[in-house]
Amino acid sequence: MTDADEDVEAAGDAAIEEPPEPRPIEPAVPEEFGLVQVWWGDGKGKTTAALGMGFRAAGHGYRVHLLQFMKGGTPSVENVRGEYNAIAAMPGFSYETTGHYGWHRRLDDVEDEHAARAESALERARELVDATRDADRDSPIPSDADPEMGVDMLLLDEVLYATNRGLIDPDDLLALIDAKPGDLELVLTGGHERPEYVTDRADLVSEVRKEVHPIDAGQAARKGTEY
């Protein structure tokens, strides 16, 4: 082996480092939260991106809550969506769903029931925003606190899909955005149509665009990737 080969091997070894031991997660107050994020598009990854941010924030000790508008509703959701089990194991991260049994217009639920569930979820979001506004924002929110004590990051998953489908009024969603406290990070996901009504209120707008998707070739949703 030449000196050059040894240098390359040494450089490769040096580039691989053991991860540090995980530290206990202590509740903390975010210093730079308060933006509105919009994730929309016909590609896969909108919910996944929101969940990733949620886990990242919770890893810093921030209180995160996921409210899903168009998902859930099975007798045992923990056996259906892997993220629910992961959230349950993560301090400072919680979730709830609207109890939809599948996607709007795909199963047998009537239109009125879908709209009622979406409106119920929006009312729940209002409650959480109000609770956060009334909370003591100078002190960390305990990781095991009920979300009604306030949250640092609120993920409204598929809320934009619900507005696209006409299940909730876009003006009601705008009112929710206007009512949020300045230090609450609000993440909105869903929908294949650009939500023009909300983009001028957002600090971040990301379009997730599909180029190729296995569903187009007949591949069903896979456990561990789609749920």
Specify the residue positions occupied by each region the protein language model found:
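Sensor-1/coupling segment of RecA-like P-loop NTPase cores
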Residues: L176-P195
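Phosphate-binding/switch loop-helix module in NTP-utilizing enzymes
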Residues: R105-G182
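Haloarchaeal acidic low-complexity proteome signature biased toward cell-envelope/secretome components but also
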Residues: M1-F33, R137-D144, A221, E226
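Conserved P-loop
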Residues: L35-R133
